Swiss-Prot record:
NCBIfam families: rRNA_mod_RlmN
Assigned EC number: 2.1.1.192
Positions with a binding annotation for [4Fe-4S] cluster: C111, C115, C118
The protein, known as: Probable dual-specificity RNA methyltransferase RlmN
GO biological process: rRNA base methylation; tRNA methylation
Family stated for the protein in its record: Belongs to the radical SAM superfamily. RlmN family.
Reactions catalysed according to its record: adenosine(2503) in 23S rRNA + 2 reduced [2Fe-2S]-[ferredoxin] + 2 S-adenosyl-L-methionine = 2-methyladenosine(2503) in 23S rRNA + 5'-deoxyadenosine + L-methionine + 2 oxidized [2Fe-2S]-[ferredoxin] + S-adenosyl-L-homocysteine; adenosine(37) in tRNA + 2 reduced [2Fe-2S]-[ferredoxin] + 2 S-adenosyl-L-methionine = 2-methyladenosine(37) in tRNA + 5'-deoxyadenosine + L-methionine + 2 oxidized [2Fe-2S]-[ferredoxin] + S-adenosyl-L-homocysteine
InterPro entries: Aldolase_TIM, Methyltransferase_A, RlmN_N, RNA_MTrfase_RlmN, rRNA_lsu_MTrfase_RlmN/Cfr, rSAM
Keyword annotations of the record: 4Fe-4S, Cytoplasm, Disulfide bond, Iron, Iron-sulfur, Metal-binding, Methyltransferase, rRNA processing, S-adenosyl-L-methionine, Transferase, tRNA processing
Cofactor: [4Fe-4S] cluster
Major subcellular location class: cytoplasm
C-alpha cells in the first residue's frame, strides 16, 4: 500500500518535490489542494502537470481510511470506526462543544499500557499508526462537514483515543506539526491537547520541543500502591519519577498540566484519596488542573462502576477546599458506545461471530 501524502509535513513535501525535479512552489500548491480545498483525488489538482501528477499517484495515496461505522449521539457526538489499509480498526470521535468542533484521535492499533478499567487495552497493541493515518482522521471529520455544506471546521484536537501517544512519539509530533501548519488546517497549538499515561522520559522530551500544545496526564490515583494496581505503567514510572518530569515540563514551558482522573466507585473516589490528590499536586498548584471524569462502564471490566454523584461531589469539594483547580468533565455520547475502544471491541466481536456463523 502506498503511504498517505497526509504523512508529510509541508517542509517534507517541499523536500520531496525538489528531489523529484520540481520547484518548491509546486509543493505549496499541492499543500493548498490537500488542506484548503481538501480534494479527494490527485486528478482534481488542475494546476499540476500530468507528468508530476503521475509521480504523485505512483508515490502516494491521499486518504488511507475507510469508514466502517458512524454512530451519532443525541447530543451531536459522532463516533467513527475507520478501517486501515491492512484491515485493522481504529476509533475517532467528533465532539460538538460550545467553543468549536473537537476531534479525539487514535494513535495506535490497540494499547499495551494495561489500565485495568479501560476498553482500549482489551486488544493489545498491534502496531503504531503512521502520521498519515493520524492526520487522515482529522480529514475524514472535516470532509464530513464539507460534504454536508456545513460551514464548520475542526477547531480543537485531543490526542486521547486508543493507544499511548508518547509510545508513538515521532508520528504524533509529525501529525501535530501538520495540523498546526498556518498554510493548511491551521488548528491552533493551544487548541490541541496530547494525553499521556505517564511516560516520564517522553514528557521531558515533549517539554523541549518548544510547542504550545497542551499536555494532559492520565493520573487516576494519588498514590503508588493504588495507581500500580489499576495502571501497570506506574510500575515503570512511579509517581516520584512522573512528577519530577511534570515539574520539569512546567519549569521549561511555563504551561499548565491537566490531570485526568476517572472516578471509580469505592476504588479511587474516597475523601482520603481526594486529600492525597490535593497534597500530591500542591507544589504545582498554580499550573495544574484536575479533570474529574465520569466512568463509562465496560462489560469486560465489571469489577468497576461509576461513582455516584454524591461521592463525586464530596471528592470535588475537598479538592476545591484545598485550592485545587478542578472540574467535573461534561459527558458526550452517553447513548452510544461511549468508552474509548468500546465501539471497536464490539464491532470486532460481531465480525468474529459472523465469521464463525459463516463457517458452520
Amino acid at each position: 500500500m502506498k503511504p498517505s501524502i497526509y504523512g508529510l509535513t509541508r517542509d517534507e513535501l517541499i523536500a520531496w518535490a525538489i528531489d523529484n525535479g520540481q520547484k518548491a512552489f509546486r509543493a505549496t500548491q499541492i499543500w493548498d489542494w490537500l488542506y484548503r480545498k481538501r480534494i479527494q483525488s490527485f486528478d482534481e489538482m488542475t494546476n499540476i502537470s500530468k507528468e508530476f501528477l503521475a509521480i504523485l499517484k505512483d508515490s502516494f495515496c491521499i486518504n488511507p481510511l475507510k469508514q466502517r461505522v458512524a454512530q451519532e449521539s443525541a447530543d451531536g457526538t459522532v463516533k467513527y470506526l475507520f478501517e486501515l489499509p491492512d484491515g485493522m480498526l481504529i476509533e475517532t470521535v467528533l465532539m460538538r462543544q460550545h467553543y468549536g468542533q473537537s476531534v479525539c484521535v487514535t494513535t495506535q492499533v490497540g494499547c499495551n499500557i494495561g489500565c485495568t478499567f479501560c476498553a482500549s487495552g482489551l486488544i493489545k497493541k498491534q502496531r503504531d499508526l503512521n502520521s498519515g493515518e493520524i492526520t487522515a482522521q482529522i480529514m475524514m471529520v472535516q470532509n464530513y462537514f464539507d460534504q454536508r455544506g456545513q460551514d464548520e471546521r475542526v477547531s480543537h484536537v485531543v490526542v486521547m483515543g486508543i493507544g499511548e501517544p508518547f509510545d508513538n512519539y515521532q508520528n504524533v509530533m509529525t501529525f501535530l506539526r501538520t495540523i498546526n501548519d498556518d498554510h493548511g488546517l491551521a488548528i491552533g497549538a493551544r487548541h490541541i491537547t496530547v494525553s499521556t499515561s505517564g511516560l516520564a522520559h517522553k514528557i521531558r522530551e515533549f517539554a523541549n520541543e518548544g510547542v504550545q500544545v497542551n499536555l494532559a496526564v492520565s493520573l487516576h490515583a494519588p498514590n503508588n500502591e493504588l495507581r500500580s494496581s489499576i495502571m501497570r505503567i506506574n510500575r515503570s514510572f512511579p509517581l516520584d519519577k512522573l512528577f519530577s518530569a511534570i515539574e520539569y515540563y512546567i519549569e521549561t514551558t511555563n504551561r499548565r498540566v491537566t490531570f485526568e482522573y476517572i472516578m471509580l466507585n469505592k476504588v479511587n473516589d474516597g475523601v482520603e484519596q481526594a486529600q492525597e490528590l490535593a497534597d500530591l499536586t500542591k507544589r504545582i498548584r498554580k499550573l495544574s488542573y484536575v479533570n474529574l471524569i465520569p466512568y463509562n462502564p465496560v462489560s469486560e471490566h465489571d469489577q468497576y462502576s461509576r461513582s455516584p454523584k454524591e461521592r463525586v461531589a464530596a471528592f470535588y469539594d475537598i479538592l476545591k477546599k484545598n485550592g485545587v483547580n478542578c472540574v467535573v468533565r461534561q459527558e458526550h455520547g452517553t447513548d452510544i458506545d461511549a468508552a474509548c475502544g468500546q465501539l471497536r471491541s464490539n464491532t470486532m466481536k460481531k465480525d468474529r461471530q459472523k465469521a464463525a456463523a459463516a463457517r458452520t
